[in-house]
Amino acid sequence: DKHGAQELLMPALIPEDVYISSGRREAFGSNMFALKDRYNKNYVLGPTHEELFAMAAMMDGKSYKDFPYNLYQIQTKYRDETRPRYGLIRVREFIMKDAYSFDTDLAGLDESYAKMYDAYNCIFDRLKLNYKIVKADTGAMGGLLSEEYQALSTIGEDTVVGCEGCDFASNMEICEVVDTIEADSSEELAMEKVYTPNVGTIEEVAGFFGKEPSDFVKTLIYKADGNLVAFILPGDRELNETKATKLLKAVELEMASAEDVEKVTHARVGFAGPVGLEIPVYMDRMVAKKKNFIVGANESDHHIKNVNLKDFEVAETADLCEVKEGDICPSCGKPLTFDHGIEVGNLFKLGTKYSDSLGLEYLDQNNKLQPVWMGSYGIGLERCMAAVADQYHDDNGLIWPEEIAPFKAAIVIVSAKDEAQKEAAEKLYAYAQEKGYDILLDDRNERPGVKFKDMELIGIPYRITLGKGVKDGKAELVKRSEGQKQ
């Protein structure tokens, strides 16, 4: 609100046509909850609301004089996740604060983006989170730029890539692998098929040939939007599916089934190779520097050694591998480091992606129609709770930062049967309420130790204990984060 945003509330049940018009119905695919009403009309449960806010802007902003402005909501979102997990971190129904900025040009979008960047920094700083801001994939959202707020956590599902020597930070999904392999200058040898019984994995093949996994080139068969494709990369590397998806401009990318692999390779799984393969082959750029490498022969129990680039066709070469810890930083050349993180917020420069598809335009100073420039900004409320709980706890329970604690303090009566203690507690509680403090009064007829344990478990920042010292006008104050008594 302090940065000029206005709060609205959009519906969760949305006509499917809204997402078809923007092209995102296909992009979300099976991750979108879909249903029909009694008239057989198609609806979806909103996974995100860029389209609706763009439509609202079409009714509000007609002239360049109406810009810039920013709208936001706090609304429930729905995504049919394949594998919901990690408690509140990846779920099918979640609450999100999403905001959308509208500007007349890129310079205006940059300014709005910077304001939201500052606002988010303030929010996560107030939550006392240990976080990193990392470059990220735009994914189904699309647009010009994406950054994520990653709360560092041992239970985080994302890998946050950092650097020992500079402030480089990236999501693993888009982190560039710096190619440090020197081109092989040796003479190209003739291909030779080798019988390799009872081996299938890279490690087994390496053991058979007495070489390192990096000396091999592995072939992975995938299905991209229903079409089979192959990716080849160094044997000691893993495919980065985000990079592969972007290269192919695919909506869905998944490993091919064993049946599909056998269909295109005419061999069991584990013996695929690029030589003679009749599907598109996409090659990681590090393979281009290799010579006389070993690949699967597309024949069960066989491999081919001394394979070179001239021996097979490549549809395209690109950076396709996942980065590994210790790889070279793209910015400064120092070793990269890994952390785990929980994505608690994100920022997107959408540009004119949704304006172009939905017809969101305004009249400029020359009375000509121009597309509106949009930004999108989200915070996952439950994810924030999960991240704070992970970063602020001990063996006795939670230690909520004061900004988001369910209560500012708890008043604990040592003996609920002691009238003096009860009276003092009720007076203190009434005073706190009058001053606007949200206080918990624990007047249960329980042993003091039980009450103390419960307050620690809940994680209330301060505990005010009223016991025998009441008769002398004394109380005990304990700060949860420090355990010190006053």
Segments and roles (model prediction):
Residues 1-81, 214, 222-223, 286-290, ...:
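Active-site loop/lid in soluble adenylation, ligation, and acyl-transfer enzymes
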